[in-house]
Design a protein with these regions (language model features):
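Active-site entrance/lid segments in N-terminal catalytic domains of soluble metabolic enzymes
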Residues: 1-219
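Glycine-rich adenosine-cofactor-binding loop
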Residues: 191, 221-230
Length: 230
């Protein structure tokens, strides 16, 4: 199947799958798509371990890494630590989680705790933490680096260009798409509200043609549809 996405990423099918599981990354890429590993909840050392495993099992096929760098936070040193993130979680969520663990006889210490993941996320959404993850990612033969929240910082886009890696970014409105293209993003991940609503409230099937029309004056930038896509 021939498309610009296939040409850019050197894949057989224009299918890109985000996952937190390295095994899924490998499986998707071996099936002709491009697996993308979510890294925001990892330390640089953990990411290195995961990517080394992928390199050893993926037979040289294309894959990518996804980070989460809110543009408004990327160059700021605001205190946004694990305690603050954890305090935002409703008690109902914590109770639901505890109930599931109890029903299935799972010890909480067998899982990565919310607090630990929140600690990494708080660090990795700031410039220093994000750059540390990107340094690890770009030391491996990735084909795509994606930002899952907003326009990537200029330095992230430049790191992609310097390493000959395509930069993708999620968006939820036509204006978001224009902002991303102007920032130099190579691939637009158009994420409708069916993806969980984190990018906006517009339905995927409405958003895709809106974005396609909006970016026409800015060049031929490929679009990946996300949200309600099975």
């Amino acid at each position: 199947m021939n498309s610009k996405i296939c040409e850019l990423l050197d894949i057989e099918f224009p299918l890109v799958a985000f996952t937190h599981c390295r095994d899924v990354v490998v499986a998707v890429s071996k099936a002709g798509g491009c697996g993308v590993l979510g890294a925001v909840g990892m330390t640089p050392e953990q990411l290195e371990e995961e990517l080394k495993w992928i390199d050893d099992h993926i037979d040289g096929l294309p894959y990518g890494v996804d980070v989460l760098i809110p543009n408004k936070m990327a160059d700021k040193d605001k205190k946004f630590d694990a305690e603050k993130l954890t305090s935002m979680i409703p008690q109902e969520y914590a109770d639901f989680r505890a109930d599931i663990l109890e029903k299935h006889d799972i010890e909480a210490n067998e899982l990565r705790t919310i607090k630990t993941a929140a600690t990494y996320m708080a660090e990795n959404t700031k410039a220093d933490g994000a750059k540390a993850l990107l340094d690890v990612a770009f030391s491996h033969p990735i084909k795509i680096i994606a930002n899952a929240l907003g326009v990537p910082p200029d330095w992230m886009v430049q790191m992609g260009k310097d390493n000959n890696v395509k930069v993708a970014a999620l968006l939820g409105t036509a204006q978001h798409a224009i902002n991303q293209v102007k920032a130099g993003v190579d691939i637009l991940v158009v994420s409708g509200t069916e993806a969980g609503g984190h990018c906006g409230s517009v339905s995927t099937m409405v958003l895709i043609p809106e974005v396609h029309q909006a970016i026409q004056p800015y060049g031929d930038v490929p679009i990946l549809a996300a949200g309600g896509i099975a």
